[in-house]
Amino acid sequence: MDVNMAAELSPTNSSSSGELSVSPEPPRETQAFLGKVTVIDYFTFQHKHLKVTNIDDMTETLYVKLPENMTRCDHLPITCEYLLGRGSYGAVYAHADNATVKLYDSVTELYHELMVCDMIQIGKATAEDGQDKALVDYLSACTSCHALFMPQFRCSLQDYGHWHDGSIEPLVRGFQGLKDAVYFLNRHCGLFHSDISPSNILVDFTDTMWGMGRLVLTDYGTASLHDRNKMLDVRLKSSKGRQLYRLYCQREPFSIAKDTYKPLCLLSKCYILRGAGHIPDPSACGPVGAQTALRLDLQSLGYSLLYGIMHLADSTHKIPYPNPDMGFDRSDPLYFLQFAAPKVVLLEVLSQMWNLNLDMGLTSCGESPCVDVTAEHMSQFLQWCRSLKKRFKESYFFNCRPRFEHPHLPGLVAELLADDFFGPDGRRG
C-alpha cells in the first residue's frame, strides 16, 4: 500500500464517531505523486498507440496493428492552402491552429514514419531524464488521408535566417539538447535516425522575429531499428490480418545520411565501393550496430552544428559548406570525395582557432593513411582544399572569431565528431 494512502486510512484520520475522515488534498500530477506511470495510466495511454497482436518467437517477428483512432477520418478538413515545405515523401501544410499536416504521396511512407513516431512517443511516455525534449511530438494520424499531424514550428535550421551574436547561446544549448535526443533514440527507443541534417532540425518560435527558439529533431522517414533490439522484424497488419508494411532494418552506406552531411567514415566507404565498382544489395545487408548507429547520428549532428557555425561567421556566403556542387555523377568516386573537402578545411581552421587536435584521417595537405586515394583524385582534392582556403581568407570568417568563444562550443564540436575518421572502420580502423 502507498505510504500516503496508509496514513490517510490510519486511526488518526478517523472521526470520533468511527467514520473514516479523509482530509482533502490539493490535486497532484500522477507523475509527481507516484514518480512513474501507473498501470491505469498505461491503459489510458496505450489504446491510442500501436498494439502488439502476435509475437513469433521462432522467426523473431513482432506483429502490430494501428489503433482505431488512426484509421478514422475525424480531423478538421485539410485545406492544403499554406504550403510549408515539400520533399520526396510529399508536402507539409499549415493546419488549424498551431499545427501542421504532413501529407504523403505513398501510404507505405506514412506507415513507416507513423510506426517510428509512435514507438518514440511510447518511449517518451516513460522517459524520466528529460533526454527526449528535443524530439518532435506527433499529434495524431489519419491513414485514410495519408496524413500525419504535428505541432507547428517557425522553420527548419536550414531555412533559419537570423544569424547574429544572440544566436550563439541558443545554438549551443539547442545542440546539447539534440545530442541528448540522439542518445535517447538509440538507447531508449532502439532507433537509428540516419538522416540528421539542418533541414530535419526545427526551430521553435520566440517572442521576437530574430530570436532562435529551441531546436527539435524531426523526420523519421528513414529511421530504422539497430541490432540491440530483441526483435528486428516488425510488421504492421490491418485489423483483418493483411500485412500493410514491414519495418526494414537492413542498411548500406549509400542510403545512410544525406550525402552532404555524411560523416567522413561513410564518405570513405562510399568512395572505396564506387572505386571498386561495387554496389551493395540492401537486402543482403544487416542492421546497423547500436554503437555504430549512435556514432553516425552524433557525427551527422556534429556536421549540422558546423552548418550553424558557418552561418554565424560567413555572412558573405563565400564558403560552400557543406555542398561544393562540383557537378559529379553519384556513380563517380569523386562525387563522395568532394564532400570531404569543406569538412576537412573547416575543421582544420577550427582546430587551429580552438587549439584542438582533431585528427580526421584526411588532411588538406593530402595525407590519407587509411584509404588509398588515387593520385588523380588526390590532386583534385588538394585543388579543392586550396580553393576553399582562399575563400576563407576572402570571407569575414576570421573577423567573427569572438562568436566562437562560447565556453562549451569547442568541446561540443569535439565530442560530436570525436570518432569520425576517413577510413572504412572509422576511428577504430
From Swiss-Prot:
Its EC number is 2.7.11.1. It is found in: Virion tegument; Host nucleus. It catalyses: L-seryl-[protein] + ATP = O-phospho-L-seryl-[protein] + ADP + H(+); L-threonyl-[protein] + ATP = O-phospho-L-threonyl-[protein] + ADP + H(+). Residues 1-409 form the Protein kinase domain. It is an enzyme of class 2 (transferase). SUPFAM superfamilies: Protein kinase-like (PK-like). Residues 36-40, 344-350 are annotated as: SUMO interaction motif. Gene3D superfamilies: Transferase(Phosphotransferase) domain 1 (1.10.510.10). The active site is at residue 195. One of its GO terms (molecular function) is protein serine/threonine kinase activity. GO terms for biological process: symbiont-mediated perturbation of host chromatin organization; symbiont-mediated suppression of host cytoplasmic pattern recognition receptor signaling pathway via inhibition of IRF3 activity. Residues 1-27 are annotated as: Disordered. Residues 14-23 have a biased composition (Low complexity). Keywords: ATP-binding, Early protein, Host nucleus, Host-virus interaction, Inhibition of host innate immune response by virus, Inhibition of host IRF3 by virus, Inhibition of host RLR pathway by virus, Kinase, Modulation of host chromatin by virus, Nucleotide-binding, Serine/threonine-protein kinase, Transferase, Viral immunoevasion, Virion, Virion tegument. GO terms for cellular component: host cell nuclear envelope; host cell nucleus; viral tegument. InterPro entries: Kinase-like_dom_sf (IPR011009), Prot_kinase_dom (IPR000719), Tyr_kinase_AS (IPR008266). SMART domains: S_TKc. ATP binds at residues 110-118, 128. Interacts with host NUP62 and NUP153; this interaction plays a role in nuclear targeting of BGLF4. Interacts with host SUMO1 and SUMO2. Belongs to the protein kinase superfamily. Ser/Thr protein kinase family. Plays many key roles by phosphorylating several proteins including the viral DNA processivity factor BMRF1, EBNA1 or EBNA2. Modifies the host nuclear envelope structure and induces the redistribution of nuclear envelope-associated proteins by phosphorylating host nucleoporins. Subsequently, promotes the nuclear transport of EBV lytic proteins. Required for efficient lytic DNA replication and release of nucleocapsids from the nucleus. This is Serine/threonine-protein kinase BGLF4. It comes from Epstein-Barr virus (strain B95-8). The lineage of its organism: Viruses, Duplodnaviria, Heunggongvirae, Peploviricota, Herviviricetes.
